[in-house]
């Protein structure tokens, strides 16, 4: 869907650090159950301001000091879309970049990749289609709830005109455009995703 590409472009800005796919939102959802006695999302409405402050402090406590001076921190975990409501409440100033792609291309790309066995939907095309519909419905709901805090970035648009998408991204995040973002593939950082090799190359349209 272009998450790794968008992440690498943004991480090429000197004011941005990417945490990678850390999965902290998963852990936060478990904490919601511990604090409220109810699973997320039902438990979200039961949280006190003290609970929310604790969730925020726990999340931030896991972030390395090396990221502390940056204006923007990115958690690019793809499954974070499930927890957008939780993240929005815990971090009132957070913004969300929704990376999307043509549904058929997106699903087939997932199907071809060797995802973990706990993601059973990724190994069956019908299950992938069902999963995509659920994801799309949830994202539509989040966009209604937080219209000013979500930016849609389509993979096809980035490939077609990377400079225009860079401008959209920095304006959304209140950052300055830096030319290095256009040469994201030159940025020296560790990328631990199945798309790692792709973000080491200039934009191409064959994926």
Question: Residues of each region from the PLM?
Answer:
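PAPS-dependent sulfotransferases, especially Golgi type II membrane carbohydrate sulfotransferases
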Residues: 40-71, 110-152, 159-207
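A secondary-structure boundary/capping signal
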Residues: 21, 154-155
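Phosphate-binding active sites in nucleotide-utilizing proteins
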Residues: 1-91, 95, 99-100
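Acidic, metal-coordinating catalytic cores used for nucleic-acid/nucleotide bond scission
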Residues: 78-79, 157-161
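Conserved nucleotide-binding/hydrolysis micro-motifs of P-loop NTPases
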Residues: 23-25, 103-106, 158-159
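Conserved P-loop NTPase nucleotide-binding/switch module
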Residues: 87-91, 97-118, 122
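Short, compositionally biased low-complexity segments
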Residues: 26-35, 104, 195-203
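Short runs of predominantly hydrophobic/aromatic residues within well-ordered alpha helices
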Residues: 80, 93-96, 103, 107, ...
């Amino acid at each position: 869907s272009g998450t790794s590409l968008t992440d690498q472009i943004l991480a090429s800005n000197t004011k941005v650090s990417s945490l990678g796919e850390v999965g902290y939102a998963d852990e936060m959802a478990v904490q919601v159950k511990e604090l409220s006695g109810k699973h997320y999302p039902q438990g979200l409405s039961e949280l006190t301001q003290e609970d929310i402050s604790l969730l925020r402090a726990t999340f931030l406590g896991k972030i390395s000091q090396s990221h502390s001076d940056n204006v923007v921190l990115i958690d690019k975990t793809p499954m974070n879309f499930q927890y957008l409501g939780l993240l929005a409440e815990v971090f009132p100033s957070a913004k969300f970049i929704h990376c999307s792609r043509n549904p058929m291309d997106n699903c087939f790309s997932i199907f071809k990749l060797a995802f973990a066995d706990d993601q059973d939907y990724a190994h069956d095309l019908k299950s992938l289609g069902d999963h995509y519909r659920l994801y799309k419905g949830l994202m539509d709901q989040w966009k209604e709830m937080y219209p000013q805090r979500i930016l849609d970035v389509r993979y096809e648009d980035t490939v077609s005109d990377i400079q225009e998408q860079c401008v959209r991204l920095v304006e959304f995040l209140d950052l300055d455009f830096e030319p290095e973002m256009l040469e994201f593939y030159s940025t020296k950082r560790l990328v631990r995703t199945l798309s790692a090799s792709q973000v080491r190359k200039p934009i191409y349209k064959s994926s």
